[in-house]
Every structure is written in structure tokens, then in C-alpha cells.
Curated annotation (Swiss-Prot):
It is an enzyme of class 1 (oxidoreductase). It comes from the Eukaryota. GO terms for molecular function: flavin adenine dinucleotide binding; N,N-dimethylaniline monooxygenase activity; NADP binding; peptidyl-proline dioxygenase activity; pipecolic acid N-hydroxylase. It comes from Arabidopsis thaliana. Belongs to the FMO family. NADP(+) binds at S219, A220, I221, D222. Keywords: FAD, Flavoprotein, Monooxygenase, NADP, Oxidoreductase, Plant defense. Required for the establishment of systemic acquired resistance (SAR). Not involved in local defense mechanisms. Confers a salicylic acid-dependent (SA) resistance to virulent pathogens such as P.syringae pv tomato and H.parasitica. InterPro entries: FAD/NAD-bd_sf, Flavin_amine_oxidase, Flavin_mOase, Flavin_mOase-like, FMO-like. This is Probable flavin-containing monooxygenase 1. GO terms for biological process: cellular response to hypoxia; defense response to bacterium; defense response to fungus; L-pipecolic acid biosynthetic process; plant-type hypersensitive response; response to other organism; systemic acquired resistance. Induction: Locally and systemically up-regulated by the bacterial pathogen P.syringae. The keyword rRNA-binding does not apply. The gene is FMO1. Its cofactor is FAD.
Amino acid sequence: MASNYDKLTSSRVAIIGAGVSGLAAAKNLVHHNPTVFEASDSVGGVWRSCTYETTKLQSARVDYEFSDFPWPNNRDDTTFPPYLEILDYLESYAKHFDLLKFMKFGSKVIEVRFIGDGETPQMVDLGAYGNLLPGKPVWEVAVQIGDSGDIQWHAFEFVVVCTGKYGDVPRIPAFPAKKGPEMFQGKVMHSMDYCKLEKEEASTLLSGKKVAVIGFKKSAIDLALESALANQGEGGKACTMVVRTTHWGIPHYWVWGLPFFLFYSSRASQFLHDRPNQSFLRTLFCLLFSLLRAVVSKFIESYVLWKLPLEKYGLKPNHSFEEDYASCQMAIIPENFFEEADKGMIRFKKSSKWWFYEEGIVFEDGTTLEADVVILATGYDGKKKLKAIVPEPFRTWLEFPSGVMPLYRGTIHPLIPNMGFVGYVQSSSNLHTSELRSMWLSRLVDEKFRLPSKEKMLDQFLKEMEVTRNSSRFYKRHCISTFSIQHADDMCNDMGLNPWRKSNFLLEAFSPYGSQDYRLGQEEKEDMTA
């Protein structure tokens, strides 16, 4: 394996990943001539590497766009665009802002080494964070070029990690001895492997087969629908979804004739929810209005139960809708999903424990499910990929025991110097979340404001997690959906921008906030570049 050290890298900033977050980071750090390492041969991230024939965006186009780049076509179309349209949009964004010249495709980052001042820290230091561009390299980055095995080393002052929480590392369930996939005589694969299949390969895999899909989140729902559609007509077999935990889903963004944003995405609606750093009086206020929040949740649940046959199939969650929204667990149910269930092409089996046997799956109640193909839609472990390239002791400090990375403003890890993270915080619009954090990070790198001490940054993160923990049992993720506007306000205040982005009070109070609200005016642009 060849290896060489590239001391001629002209950039001071490296960006790892060219998905949505990587593109947003590159565009906002363009004046630093960043080097963007992307393992694949094009931009798009998970939208290119892991999509199915039926995959669509979970929102309308206007709710998934960059602040300074509206959708060029069909922007006002309220339907959810398929993944090919999203890829085209992301590619157009990269070309419009001339970002491709910064890209190094076919370049997989396999290791980063700390080469900052002195020895690698062995103890937690809660003092000042330090300069993000100190004038000399802080990290060495090892990059594998294509399939050649050649390794190049580059040195940078600042590294932005944009591989995201999904990454390309599948989360595989653990099984007791002699009860794992090796016992099964059929085909076992993760959803990540399925989405790499060509259309004809996928159809051949599913058609006429007894398919079991493990999971009940977005990927699992898409896969079950895809299996049902591949088995239409004579000889078609039903797909069975193995469900451990049910979550609320909605058919569209209207509830009893009212737009969904009225309930969670306006200042008025989020005012009813707890937020970090709130006063005692505000805590008391939120406690008093907890009944109103419960009424809102029940109101939405009543519509979902009327519109979708969750009770018919035993899929009604035993927790509130608000819990799923507060932990970013809500999904949009495809319009023909339950149509296929009513036709008998999608079936459901609830079980918290299961394992393999020769013919299929055994459940904890002793029943069995025969299968030809088992697809594990059990999620991804993007942080495992991150841990593989980050050295100690930073690897140990990377996440808390809960599994959540302690990121200040969702971007800076207080214990890891000169490294930013974009795409690891969730909200109702992950593109908007990533873009705003990229804007904030750019101003931070440009020294437009200073970070507080590491201790204060960790304290702020803990307060955010406390809000999520008090709102939902599914708190092991950094989700800001119920206080996203206040989170954006804090970032605007850091950047010296007016956090109130609407033209009048009524819009400020009752209209939704999105990426277009954070498009910089001419005066703001001049202030930012001054």
C-alpha cells in the first residue's frame, strides 16, 4: 500500500463528506478555499448512496431548500419530490455556487491524527476552546484514493466532519449463539445493502419471495411498500413487517383542515414548550400549559387514527404524538402503504425479541415466520464510522454514555479542538438545520464572535438534552424540533443578526420558520464580510 504526505495542500480547512451538510459547509466556507473529501464519485450523500425506487422527500419542496437557492422547477408543487429530483437539486446547487472545484471525489478519509501544540491531551480541559485557524496544522488527514489502496496525507488547521448520523455503517442487531443470520437458509441483508442494488436486481430479489422487513421507521416502511409493489399479480407473496416499537406517522401536513406548522413550527406554538436556559417563571408557565400541549397532541392523534388504520393493525403507539415529534421520530406514511396492507400484501407482527432459524424467524411467543428474504431496516451507526477515524482520547470523549455527541450549537465539540460537526443535530428540516449551522460555523472561523468556555458549552448542551429527556422517552438523540426557533435565535445573536426574521408581528408569531427566513439581506451580507 503506497503512502505519501502531501505538504502542498493549499487549503487550511478540510470538509469530510459532500452530502447536504458538506455542500452547505463548503458554500459557507468557500472564502477559505476548502478541500472537500468525498468517498463516492459525486455529491448527494445518503440521497445517492441509499435510496429505493419508492423513496421520496418527507416534506414539500419549499420546506427543503437552501436559503439562497430556491428550487428551480416546480417549487410550488405541494407533492413530495422523489429522490432523483432531490439529487438534481443538490447537483444544481453545487454547480451554481461553483463548489465542484473544491471536491476530491473517490477520496475516503480513513484516519485523522492530532498534531496540535504539545502532546495529545490525556485529561479533560474545561478552559478556553482556542483559535480555530491558529496559523499551523492541527490535524493530519489520511485519504485513500479510489480502489488503488494509495494513501495520501494532508495537513489542515480546521476539519469539518459532515458524514452525518447515517453514514454508511449499518446497525446490526445482536443475536444469541446459534440464533443469528448464519442459521437462516435464505437471504439476509441490511437496508443499506439493498439500496445499492440496481432496479432489476431489487425486483428479482423481492418478486415472488416471502419477505420480512425488520423495523417500522421510514426505511422499513419504504421497503415494505417496495416489496408489496414487486409482488403484484399472480404468484406475488406478502411482505411481513416485524415491529418492535411503533411510532406515530402522518399521511400529510394537514390536520383536520389546519396546516401542521400551527402546532409545532411557529413561535407561538413553540412558546408552549420547555427550552434550555428558561427562567423559573417560564418553567412554571410551561407546566401550567402542559394540559394544552396534551390537548394538541390528542387532537393530532385523533386525526391520524381517523385517517390511518393504526388500531386495525395493532400499530397504535402507547405514547403521545408529542413524544415522537420531540425526539424526531415522526414519519410521513406513503399514501398507498395501507392500501397494500388492506390488500393483504403488507402484514405486521409485533415482537420485541426475535431470532433466526433455518426457515425464517422465531418470535418470543414461540410463533414462527417463514421467509425467503430478511431485510434489516434497523438504522445506521454513523458515529461508529467516526470513531474509527478519530484518535484517542477524542474517540472516548466523542459521545456521552447516552450515545449523543455533546455539540455546542449542534456544531462544536468542546473537548475536540479545531473540529466542527455539521449534520448531527435533528429537527423537522435537517437541510435547514445543517445550513444554519454552516453559516454559524463560517462566522466563528472568521472570528466574528468568540466561543464561551468549554465548561459553559457543555452546560448548554446538557440543558438541551434535559429538555428532550423531559419531553420524550426517546431522548437518545440530539433533536431540537420543539425549540428549533429559539436555537436559531441563539445562533443569530452569536452572528450579530436580528433573530426576528419576519416582516410583521403576526407573521412572526404564527407563521412557520424555514430556510428562506435566514436568507441574508444586502446589509447583513456587508456586515458579515466587514
